Amino acid sequence: MICVTGDLHGDISRFKSPVLKKLRRGDALIITGDFGCIWNGSKKEKRTLKKLGKKKYNVLFVEGVHENFDLLNEYPVEQWCGGKTRLISGNLRQLMRGQYYTIAEKTVFAFGGGQSEENNSYLEPDDEKNWIKELPTDEELAEGLANLAEHDNTADFIISYEPPARMIEFIDIGTTSRNHINTYLDKVLDTAKFKMWFFGKRHINKLIPPRYRCIFDAVEVADDTRLPKQKKPKKQKPEKVKKEKPEKKTKKDKKTGEEE
């Protein structure tokens, strides 16, 4: 079973949704960007991340634009379910840009990152360095198309922060603003076969028939396939090492000096 929700901005009250009570071990909640729970590196924040990582289901997110990329990039990268992820804590992971996964028996193409609406207001060189990290690199764009092509340009679900350019007019009527990520996702739209595309950023919940969903604070079931109940993996106890008994000292005959 896979559920999807939108921008969190560090607000974990979304996890109280009754929908999530249906999720089992091996299922997943996917967040479409602006996770925002990796922000200042405080002890409280680390406790929150540990708590989310202890959920029985997988908590997965693509990055948006309101993230602390310096902190996020410190987490280790590892292969998981077919694609690269950043392991945050336990069952909490970042799905990386342009990666392809098999999650809860469904295929998912993920593409996080975007262009902040505040970019034009940055004045300091350091600010520019920060927002550049929001943007996908040419290598990530190319890798995304290559990964899709490797899987016959087919996925059950596409998860992105930005919408494809063609969807913007259905969300913001009269808006002509586009960026190169929107245009790139249009290319994905033209080549990929998929069941549903979820994206965030716009802070509204809106279905664009037949296969596109702009999502914000709703928690929706993308796939309700019930996986068999999985047993919690048992912690392996370290094997006890048997202590060797010391050899018994032999007595010597006082007269001969020989050992008895």
Please report, for each region that a protein language model flagged, where it lies by residue:
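Active-site donor-binding loop signature of nucleotide-sugar glycosyltransferases
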Residues: R97, G113, E128, D217-V219
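Short aromatic-enriched loop/helix-cap "lid" or pocket-rim segments at secondary-structure transitions
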Residues: K43, N73-Y75, N120-L123, F170-D172, ...
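Short, solvent-exposed loop/turn segments at secondary-structure junctions
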Residues: H9-G10, G36-I38, H66-N68, G113-E117, ...
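Beta-strand-turn-beta hairpins that frame and shape the catalytic cleft
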Residues: M1-C3, Q99-A110, F157, P209-R213
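Binuclear metal-dependent phosphoesterase catalytic core
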Residues: T102, D186-T191, R202-E260
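Active-site-proximal loop/helix segment associated with metal-binding centers of metalloenzymes
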Residues: G90, A104-T176
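Core catalytic region of metal-dependent phosphoesterases/phosphodiesterases
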Residues: T5, G10-I103, G174, I181-L185, ...
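Proline-aspartate-enriched helix->loop->beta-strand connector
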Residues: A155, I159-S160, K193-F194, F198-F199
